[in-house]
């Protein structure tokens, strides 16, 4: 039997921000299953997240997660870390691929200034940026008109593309600490993103798409989930449009992941 690959978005998918005592038993059950499948060499696991690597580590510590996914792709999958001999090591191979093209904060500032001036809107940095970043993320607060929001954001994506930069947008998730009625704006190198990370792992391990199961809950999961044959949107997702597009987990959060991973490795989704 060929090995299977399990892919998880992190915030509000693999990790519930408001994990309570009742949730902990479901979390432990999920981790126990993933540990068993990993030790039996049945699956490989990877987290694909927009969060920074340190943020992922801190959140795992909050709920005392013990299972270590083999790979963590942080910063909207622009950085890759692999569990090796008791610690996570950043992949130099992946880093070289990410930085194969110019990616400068000054260029991104110019792009945002252009759109800000054209539409009289503001883009707010989500954090303090350091030098040589691989992911720059901003908030855009809704104008109050969904169609107008999309018009502005699609213009941003087009203009960024004209400057040879990759920009993405998705609705912010207040459950993950984002503001209400806002959008996440993400700039990454072209060789980055959750879909790119998925295809990188497929090539690295020679895994066909039919042997992959993916989970997500928000707009930045849409591209990679759409690429997979076996993909689930978390039933706790707040994105109504995505709920119409993808199969929903039977249960939210840890329970949902546990059930569908079990069914997947048992071959119930094979055809």
UniProtKB/Swiss-Prot annotation:
Transmembrane segments: none annotated. InterPro entries: HAD-like_sf, HAD-SF_hydro_IIB, HAD_sf, SPP-like_dom. Keywords: Hydrolase. Pfam families: S6PP. Its EC number is 3.-.-.-. One of its GO terms (molecular function) is magnesium ion binding. It comes from the Bacteria. One of its GO terms (cellular component) is cytosol. The keyword Hydrolase applies. Coiled coil: none annotated. NCBIfam families: HAD-SF-IIB. Belongs to the HAD-like hydrolase superfamily. This is Uncharacterized hydrolase in edin-B 3'region.
